[in-house]
A protein has these predicted regions:
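Active-site-proximal alpha-helix that buttresses catalytic centers in soluble enzyme cores
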Residues: 1-317
């Protein structure tokens, strides 16, 4: 029987309302609630089961250095999307140590077919998505990548190159600051004695690459508040002409900023370009964190995966 203040002692209702033996007497038992609203923790993101492989197309002559760089970029992408099947194919590869892009794609296609046949379901999509490890367009290299894709018979998809993009402007800024050629933080107005007052943005791929690099160059110029001009390493005299143009506009201390990942150029080319311009050079972009994030962002856009904000960026076209 219940009283006005609650169930009577000894009644079934009272027993049901009593706290468990381990609970403190007289205290309410708080049940865990699922967090909602903007403070709710996001669900952990993972690659969908059966998602296409991400194949990183690495240009240039294969080497231990280019393999380490590509593996680090792939590792960054995997850390942002657990379960991602990331592979590396070399445009100029051709052996077990440095497998060619064509061979990697053919192997991915064979595995994809076996999986589809085992599931007995319609083909869900491409076997692989190819992401060129290039900061900007290089028509000759992209033509070779497309040819390898066609020869593989994989039906793989090809994404855009990584730039132009604000994240690449950030990476360029970091590389310049590491070389002592720019302030490490544009918000801190301390003086760097060797800071450049004019930047040559070095790229490869001819005029198309120069125009694309110029877009990222404008973003870099806004970050550093110094003039930035793009020039092609593969156009004779372009670097020295650009250096002269900057000096004529008032720049006294120039710096070379490679708008390059690294494997796409031969050893010594950057040093020769810096000597031609009469200035110091920063390192190539390499496996900087945003490079791996852009690789993943291009893959995700092709596959239809929505990434968290920190793992993607808004491209500039």
């Amino acid at each position: 029987m219940s009283s006005p203040t609650g169930p009577a002692p000894g009644s079934p209702d009272f027993d049901a309302a009593s706290p468990s033996p381990g609970a403190a007497p007289g205290l309410p038992v708080r049940m865990p609630r699922r967090q909602t609203g903007r403070h709710r923790k996001p669900e952990p993101l993972a690659a969908p089961e059966g998602a296409p492989a991400l194949v990183l197309a690495v240009p240039g002559t294969p080497s231990g250095a280019s393999r380490s760089l590509a593996e680090e970029v792939s590792s960054i992408a995997r850390s942002e999307l657990p379960g991602l099947d990331a592979r590396i194919g070399y445009v100029d590869g051709g052996d077990d140590e440095f497998p060619s892009l064509e061979a990697v794609l053919a192997h991915a296609a064979a595995e994809h077919k076996d999986r589809v046949d085992a599931d007995g379901q319609p083909d869900p999509g491409p076997a692989a998505v190819v992401v060129p490890l290039l900061a900007g367009p290089d028509s000759a290299l992209l033509r070779r990548i497309r040819q390898a894709m066609m020869n593989s018979g994989s039906g793989a998809e090809l994404t855009d190159v990584l730039g132009p993009h604000p994240l690449l402007a950030e990476a360029l800024h970091v590389r310049l600051s590491e070389a002592g050629l720019a302030r490490a933080d544009r918000a801190r107005l301390f003086t760097v004695a060797t800071a450049a007052d004019g930047i040559i943005l070095a790229t490869v791929g001819g005029e198309e690459a120069v125009q694309a690099a110029g877009i990222t160059g404008m973003l870099l110029s806004a970050r550093l508040a110094v003039p930035v001009l793009a020039a092609a390493l593969d156009q004779e005299g372009a670097i020295s002409r650009t250096a002269e143009q900057l000096r004529e506009s008032g720049s006294q201390q120039l710096a070379l900023a490679p708008y390059l990942i690294g494997p796409e150029i031969s050893d010594g080319l950057l040093g020769a370009a810096a000597a031609e311009a009469g200035c110091a050079s920063a390192e190539a972009l390499g496996a900087y964190g945003t490079v791996g994030r852009l690789v993943l962002s291009n893959y995700a856009a092709a596959v239809g995966i929505t990434l968290p904000t920190q793992a993607q960026g808004v491209p500039v076209r």
